[in-house]
């Protein structure tokens, strides 16, 4: 078996981004993905800071801009829909709550998939079921495909990573809940958002949000609530929807119409929010990337940047190490650890700031939002938004330059 065959588990953003740079470094890449095909749609993600630089080096920025969702900024509203605070998209140099470039997760994943498809093997509708390492390689068993051996296996399969569970240990050892649950889905409605990402808070730590999609009448909606860990079946969509409906039954603004839309949404997603912390992102010939190794939660707005930068650095270090995977993985950790540590610091107020429990807490949070562009509050949030670019991207030779697609 050649020593340059690498398996990536996960075809979201981190996995294909890693495949792109690995192929430029001369590696043979296979990606396995549980879904039967690339997943379309999803919520909007930010291209900011160093993550945007990686997309530029891949030659994909023009296409990303063409696919981006035009949003005027972020707005808070009360029960009657009256605006209580606004933050335009050009605040903080286009690096605020709504960044200069917002793109649907599925659209960004598709761009990366198309950029890697010609020279990357994809195994859809499959997953890893076993990992057995020896001194020379990793033997991987799959749910459908025949067993194969790889020089390296990378888990880029999200916070509930199968690879991490097989090679590192149970999820409870690494995923740290922040006592916040969220659901996202796409609605088609004539709700007039006027181009704004709109959020409404209700007492009890309840949040309703809606933002424009890319298509006319398309709304990316969400419900979030604070709660200690709940016992729920991640596969039982009906039970999850009923849980959300009960929590938000008496919430105002547009919650009732969005709850109705939730019942028929084809892309309903529900999960707890938690951060992933590991002392090391590798175990022998198995490594973790993106949310699988260092999920920061959506509250930080840095998950996409962490995935893109992590992919660039991991591939670059593997190419630079000349086959010494242990050296490459140590260097990957050295370069990424400070960036990840900064990114995983939640914004001021954390979950309580995002979803205040009381009416007074909501009013105080709205006041801080209205003051966000003024000193001294501006400095607090500017430091949070600046984290996206708080890493010096190494140059890894010709492969770092990318190519126009």
Regions found by a protein language model. Name each.
Residues 1-4, 24, 66, 81, ...:
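C-terminal helical "tail/cap" subdomain of flavin- and related membrane-associated enzymes
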Residues 2-6, 23-25, 48-184, 228-245, ...:
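Conserved N-terminal helical subregion
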Residues 5, 28, 218:
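Residues at the starts of beta-strands that form the adenosine-phosphate
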Residues 7-24, 30-36, 154-155, 183, ...:
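Conserved mid-domain beta->alpha element of the FAD-binding
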Residues 62, 189-195, 230-231, 254, ...:
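Short helix-loop capping/hinge motifs at secondary-structure junctions, enriched
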Residues 66-67, 121, 250-266, 325-330:
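Acidic/histidine metal-binding catalytic segments
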Residues 175-180, 194-197, 236, 253-270:
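A short coil-to-beta-strand element that immediately follows conserved catalytic motifs
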Residues 185, 196-230, 248:
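Active-site substrate-recognition segment that forms the wall
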């Amino acid at each position: 078996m050649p020593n340059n065959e690498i398996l990536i588990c996960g075809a979201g953003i981190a996995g294909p981004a890693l495949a792109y740079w690995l192929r430029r470094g001369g590696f043979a890449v296979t990606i396995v993905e549980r879904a039967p095909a690339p997943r379309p749609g999803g919520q909007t993600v930010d291209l900011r800071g160093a993550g945007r630089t990686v997309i530029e080096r891949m030659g994909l920025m023009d296409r990303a801009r063409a696919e981006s969702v035009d949003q005027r900024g972020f707005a808070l509203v009360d029960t009657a829909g009256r605006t209580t605070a606004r933050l335009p998209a050009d605040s903080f140099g286009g690096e605020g709550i709504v960044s200069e470039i917002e793109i649907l997760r599925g659209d960004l994943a598709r761009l990366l998939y198309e950029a890697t498809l010609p020279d990357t093997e994809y195994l859809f509708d499959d997953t890893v079921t076993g990992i057995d390492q020896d001194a020379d390689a990793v033997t991987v068993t799959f749910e459908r495909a025949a067993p194969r051996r790889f020089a390296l296996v990378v888990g880029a399969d999200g916070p509930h990573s199968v690879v991490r569970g097989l090679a590192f240990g149970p999820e409870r050892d690494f995923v740290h809940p922040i006592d916040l649950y969220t659901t996202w889905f796409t609605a088609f409605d004539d709700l007039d958002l006027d181009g704004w990402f709109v959020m409404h808070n209700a007492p009890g730590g309840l949040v309703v949000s809606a933002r424009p999609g890319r298509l006319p009448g398309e709304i990316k909606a969400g419900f979030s609530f604070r709660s200690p860990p709940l016992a729920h079946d991640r596969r039982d969509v009906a039970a999850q929807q009923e849980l959300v409906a009960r929590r938000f039954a008496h919430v105002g603004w547009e919650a009732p119409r969005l709850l109705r839309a939730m019942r028929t949404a084809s892309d309903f997603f529900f999960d707890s929010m938690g951060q992933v912390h590991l002392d090391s992102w590798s175990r022998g010939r198995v490594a973790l990337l993106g949310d699988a190794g260092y999920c920061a939660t959506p509250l930080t707005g840095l998950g996409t940047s962490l995935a893109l930068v992590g992919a660039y650095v991991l591939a670059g270090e593997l190419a630079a190490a000349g086959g010494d995977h242990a050296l490459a993985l140590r260097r990957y950790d050295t370069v990424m650890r400070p960036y990840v540590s900064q990114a995983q610091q939640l914004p001021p107020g954390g979950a309580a700031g995002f979803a205040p429990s009381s009416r007074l807490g909501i009013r105080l949070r709205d006041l801080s939002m209205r003051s966000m562009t003024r000193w001294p509050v501006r400095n607090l949030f500017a430091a949070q938004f600046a984290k996206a670019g708080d890493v010096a991207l190494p140059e890894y030779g010709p492969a770092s330059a990318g190519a126009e697609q």
